[in-house]
């Protein structure tokens, strides 16, 4: 039976590259982004035409639990989650507003909870599933001028380790990939 993967942050960069690879591997896809839905629809159409897969595009702000619930209800069964959506805020912590801190933590870390909380019951029922969270080397070593981003990615690392232990008896794999600096639009300032 064909596997179905949901990829957040799929309209560009790492998310787009992962979508292209999984389409090549024959996965049916649910592509998710917050702002670039027209670009995402074009990508979905391209992947369908090239690979003959089912590929749907969803607009969803993963920092909003109600949008996550609604999107997942539309998407249906998901076998693999690749949670790539993320944002950063560059600047001194002392200059950062609480709203900016919360936006980074909600988008990068709390969204892991929102997505997992909704997907885990169906995966436990099937006794199968994969959850993959995109982290960063900054989650392990920290980065000056990116305290919120570093904290959110460190949180993802701990979240992943704990959830992997919790879900291992249900045959659900939980992992994180901690990238270094990748040449994406998000990192153009480096």
Where are these regions (language model features)?
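Active-site helix of classical SDR
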Residues: 116, 152, 160
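Residue(s) in the substrate-gating loop at a strand-loop-helix junction
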Residues: 136
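Conserved glycine-rich cofactor-binding loop
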Residues: 11-12
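Conserved glycine-rich Rossmann-like NAD(P)H-binding loop of the short-chain dehydrogenase/reductase
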Residues: 25-42
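Active-site loop immediately N-terminal to the catalytic Tyr-X3-Lys motif
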Residues: 94, 141-147, 169-170
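Substrate-binding pocket helix/loop in short-chain dehydrogenase/reductase
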Residues: 92-93, 100-105
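Alpha-helical segment proximal to the catalytic Tyr-Lys
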Residues: 121, 165-169
């Amino acid at each position: 039976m064909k596997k179905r993967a949901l990829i957040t942050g799929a309209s560009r960069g790492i998310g787009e590259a992962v979508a292209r690879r999984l389409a090549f591997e024959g996965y049916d896809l649910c592509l998710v982004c917050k702002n670039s839905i027209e670009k995402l629809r074009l990508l979905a159409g391209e992947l369908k035409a090239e690979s003959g897969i089912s590929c749907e595009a969803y607009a969803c702000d993963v920092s909003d639990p109600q949008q996550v619930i609604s999107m997942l209800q539309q998407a249906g069964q998901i076998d693999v989650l690749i949670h790539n959506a993320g944002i950063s805020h560059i600047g001194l912590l002392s200059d950062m507003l609480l709203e900016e801190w919360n936006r980074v933590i909600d988008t990068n870390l709390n969204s892991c909870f929102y997505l997992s909380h909704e997907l885990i019951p169906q995966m436990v029922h099937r006794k199968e599933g994969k959850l993959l969270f995109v982290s960063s080397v900054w989650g392990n070593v920290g980065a000056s001028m990116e305290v919120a981003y570093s904290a959110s990615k460190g949180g993802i690392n701990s979240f992943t380790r704990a959830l992997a232990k919790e879900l291992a008896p249900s045959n659900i794999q939980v992992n994180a990939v901690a990238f270094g600096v990748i040449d994406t639009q998000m990192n153009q300032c480096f």
